[in-house]
Amino acid sequence: MEPTQTINLIALSLIVVVHAGVLALRLGISLGRN
């Protein structure tokens, strides 16, 4: 694999993880308020 492909994969996975974390946080906050 080319280095650029590896970097792109790492960046994509990081973005996915961050999005999942933000969604989980929002869900937890909204559930906690109810």
Curated annotation (Swiss-Prot):
Native source organism of the sequence: Prochlorococcus marinus (strain MIT 9312)
GO terms for biological process, alphabetical: photosynthesis
Classification lineage: Bacteria, Bacillati, Cyanobacteriota, Cyanophyceae, Synechococcales
Entry membrane topology: Single-pass membrane protein
InterPro entries associated with the record: PSI_PsaM
Similarity section: Belongs to the PsaM family.
Stated name of the protein: Photosystem I reaction center subunit XII
Domain of life: Bacteria
Coarse class of the protein's main subcellular location: membrane
Signal peptide as annotated in the record: none
Keywords: Membrane, Photosynthesis, Photosystem I, Thylakoid, Transmembrane, Transmembrane helix
GO cellular component: photosystem I; plasma membrane-derived thylakoid membrane
Location within or outside the cell: Cellular thylakoid membrane
Bilayer-crossing regions: 9-29
